Amino acid sequence: MCYNPFCIDGDSRVVSCARNPGEKRGGSMKPAAILDVGSSKVVCLCGSMVDKDGIVVHGAGISAYAGFRDGAFLDKQSLHNAVVDCVHKTEQESRLRIRDVALTVPASFARLELCDATIALGSSRLVESGDVDRLIHLSLQKAKKEEGWTLMHSTPVFFMVDGVSSTEMPDGVTAEEVSALVSHMFVRDEFIRTIQDALDDLGVEISMCVSAQLGEAVMLIPDNERVRPAVLIDIGYMQTDIAVVENAALTGLSTLPVGGYQFASDLSFGLDVPMEAAEQAKRRFVFSLDYRDKTEVLRTAAGSKKVSHQAISYIIEARAGELAGMIRREMEKLGVNLDARPAVYVSGGGLLMMRGGLDFLRNALNLPLKRDMPWTPRLSSPNYCSAFGALDFVLKANSSPEESMAKQKDDRVAGLLEKIKNFFMK
């Protein structure tokens, strides 16, 4: 099994080593399944693409688990049970047997490296696909060889053709020299092994790995807004991931150890109530309301407790303000020019599930934040963005408009994949 698909996204051409390539059947392609491992839940989706852009979800499974923190799972048995449960639910609802899944990789288990490369073509001639492959492979050789990591995908950020910058694939262009900046995404081997151990009980294999942030960013942020660096802020339950995306590649990735859990934890400590009661208060909270002289009754196993709405507001807004400051500083560290007013999208359920959360963050950061989760008949809330982003990414990869061209180049791609595999086995 190969876990290092080689992707070229610049011209919508994506070649991967997924075990089951897409098939067109009656206007739709063969269903694909993804497994999205979040910081508090696991989501399995089975869907297919219709009419090029539409996605039909045949089945979905969602299971909560203990989560992960600082790049480590808090309870592997809890994760194991959640993976098995959500795949079973998806199979039952879709009435399809899932044999393999595309696995999303959270930022905590991913590593990003940007490397450039240049090739001289000698006398001026047409750039061929093989030249682009060689560019990407040369840039990969500059990446750090760290034990315990495997390549997920490599995506060109931009090309330089005889000194002229271009985001288009240079195939067929006449040039003497071609350069490229390439985004290489790696996945921690231990992450793959842990998930595969759970899937082994079901007879399911991992067909490919996809960066959760890349799939989500490409789905949410329009192409024209990714011509210059754009930002995706995913505020989850245990952490906040910040990704910088340019064209169809990630150029920056960072994680902050703050999410929806910390809001509830602060309430639990500050109000001296159990986490369950704190979660209830958090979910009912609305930013920017005048809570003077109002109280709320929190029900616990030991009875009821009356607390001041002002106290709840103070605790939540203090944590939200702190998170906003951390996000701003992290974006600046990643090289984002905030004065240029970049496109910034927000997803995840850690803050957006609280009413008024987006407006609070927008005002705190003084940036035109956007929330643009595509409408779906179900699971349309922002905490499912990464799952739908992965499904969208995989389905489009399998239904490339240049499918016939990809088939003709299978041998070339397979040879390159073998070179990449050998590179990491040295």
Where are these regions (language model features)?
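Residue-level signature of catalytic and energy-coupling elements of molecular machines
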Residues: 35, 44, 103, 199, ...
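Glycine-rich phosphate-binding "P-loop"
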Residues: 310-322
